[in-house]
Amino acid sequence: MEFHQIDERNQALLSKIAVDDGHGENSPYFDGWKAYDNDPFHPEDNPLGVIQMGLAENQLSFDMIVDWIRKHPEASICTPKGLERFKSIANFQDYHGLPEFRNGIASFMGKVRGGRVQFDPSRIVMGGGATGASETVIFCLADPGDAFLVPSPYYAAFDRDLKWRTRAQIIRVHCNSSNNFQVTKAALEIAYKKAQEANIKVKGVIITNPSNPLGTTYDRDTLKTLVTFVNQHDIHLICDEIYSATVFKAPTFISIAQIVEEMEHCKKELIHILYSLSKDMGLPGFRVGIIYSYNDVVVRRARQMSSFGLVSSQTQHLLAAMLSDEDFVDKFLAENSKRLAERHARFTKELDKMGITCLNSNAGVFVWMDLRRLLKDQTFKAEMELWRVIINEVKLNVSPGSSFHVTEPGWFRVCFANMDDNTVDVALNRIHSFVENIDKKEDNTVAMPSKTRRRENKLRLSFSFSGRRYDEGNVLNSPHTMSPHSPLVIAKN
């Protein structure tokens, strides 16, 4: 059964949300995942499979989490030592969450920010992961048709998380490589004016700090510019800070919470923070999303809405114990930062040897890789052609910049912290062979007549890297079926 097909009968029977493409998943960002699901790399069982470099997971310090759990079996209600709390934890819990969990989260958020700011546990609101928390905030702040200004490039799934069910809009604040994609006041004003001219009501600005996909942090002046901008226009500022503990080198991460305390005339009720343990602790499966708002009404309403996506009490109980262990938290944060720095340095150093540069970054679990020189021309069409070869032939799931709405073709987000060292070696070897092959083809075309050279340039990305061409038939029979509008499917037509 091909679940992506919606016939006329279902078009009439179902809601607009159920039948439209507002989910935003018809993009190379999600199709790369599906390509991996259909042909996952395994060093022994499937050594020629697709390596997952499109998933922003932090698995580098997972051993520390496992070791802590092994030493503290009482933290789980599903072990003999934790059973005495089973009934009290398994019973219905208040929407506020376990007090010890909210205290632990507030303490952890403060530690991640170097103790430079404190968080009030009474303002902690839970959500079903950062996705659920993000959507809840949008429901609290905007009506269908209202818009948020979002600097681009931005997290590819925002099109789903922020827009699909809320029916809000995203208006891009265009940033470019001339200043390393930094947000400027001029760019904000241009986007705001564009919305006004289209008679669209702007309800706020949304940023990710540290940035996904750039891996950079906002400096103090830019954050103050953003606060001043929202104050002047009396709109909200939502700061997604889920990568705040992934900073691995200078400059130090600055939270919007610090700016709120520093600025004398800041309208605090306009500031909201999104947080999660998915990236900072590498626990995406626990679905811990956090809303921290300085607006009392938002805190109250978000808490009521959280009934649609609560964090399980068992998860809260375990994490409350873990986060209250200050010695463990201190060691984890320091070691995690060290491991991220080492992996990032190793990965970018090897890319540099191949002539591939990345945006200078200091945070996150990915690099913003510059492959503009490999495009046959500077267009997004050429970017998609290159991406298809990387997916289908090089067998690496990397995410093209177009899926993050970047303004310049040729940038790719590549995740480096979701695999072991051996898999990193395989991935780097594949990239090296790929680039070397292209460079050789370029060298061989230099002496060709111009007409022949043009033909070779068009074909230079069509070589068979692995000796196995992508079998679209297998994709269409997979339980992870791609939409007929998928860039990977369209590529074959």
UniProtKB/Swiss-Prot annotation:
Residues found modified as N6-(pyridoxal phosphate)lysine: 279
- UniProt keyword annotations, A-Z: Ethylene biosynthesis, Fruit ripening, Lyase, Pyridoxal phosphate, S-adenosyl-L-methionine
Reaction equation(s) it catalyzes: S-adenosyl-L-methionine = 1-aminocyclopropane-1-carboxylate + S-methyl-5'-thioadenosine + H(+)
- Tell me yes or no: is Mitochondrion among this UniProt entry's keywords: no
What domain of life is recorded for the organism? Answer: Eukaryota
A Pfam family that this protein carries is Aminotran_1_2
List GO BP terms, alphabetically. Answer: ethylene biosynthetic process; fruit ripening
Induction behaviour? By tissue wounding.
Q: Which cofactor does it need?
A: pyridoxal 5'-phosphate
The pathway noted for it is: Alkene biosynthesis; ethylene biosynthesis via S-adenosyl-L-methionine; ethylene from S-adenosyl-L-methionine: step 1/2
Q: Does the keyword Lyase apply?
A: yes
Q: What is its EC number?
A: 4.4.1.14
Q: Which PROSITE patterns match?
A: AA_TRANSFER_CLASS_1
Function as written in the Swiss-Prot or TrEMBL entry: Catalyzes the formation of 1-aminocyclopropane-1-carboxylate, a direct precursor of ethylene in higher plants.
How it assembles, according to the record, is:
Homodimer.
Query: Would you identify the family this protein belongs to, as annotated?
Result: Belongs to the class-I pyridoxal-phosphate-dependent aminotransferase family.
User: Could you tell me what this protein is called?
Assistant: 1-aminocyclopropane-1-carboxylate synthase CMW33
Instruction: State the organism named in the record.
Output: Cucurbita maxima
